[in-house]
Amino acid sequence: GFTFIVDKKKLVQDLLEVRILLEPSIASMAAVHADDEDIKKITALCDEVEDLLKKHEDHTQKDIDFHAAIALSSKNVVVPRLVPVINSSIPLFVETTRGTLLEETIETHREIADAIAAHDPLRAQDAMYLHLVYNRKQIQMIKKDSE
């Protein structure tokens, strides 16, 4: 794990770089391979994250579940082994951005879920990339403000 890494700001940035490399492609694979059950699960988790965000309640676990469901829907045997890296980064991102990406998270999660449901790999890839870029931009702004 990443428990012993002292520089949390560097860790957040590095995890985000790795997620930007991996997750858009994972979303694309999920759009190609997701079956009806996968799509139901992804859509339900998207709804749950949105509901929690709108109530200003902790959405971290459901957010983790959403990204994990997408990874499993890729049907790639290696991807689930990457999920712990993605999962460990989400609480750090939520903590770092302090809920400032409420609308962006709702919109991009919905776009990712819709693209996967439509079996549109390019749209899913773009939506996931946009989701992560919003996070990166917000984290960079927070880093700048704290310097």
What are these regions (language model features)?
Residues 15-95, 105-113, 123-136:
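Conserved amphipathic alpha-helical segments that form helical-bundle/coiled-coil interaction surfaces
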Residues 1-21, 28, 145-147:
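Short linear motifs at protein or domain termini
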Residues 137-147:
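Generic C-terminal helix-cap and adjacent flexible tail
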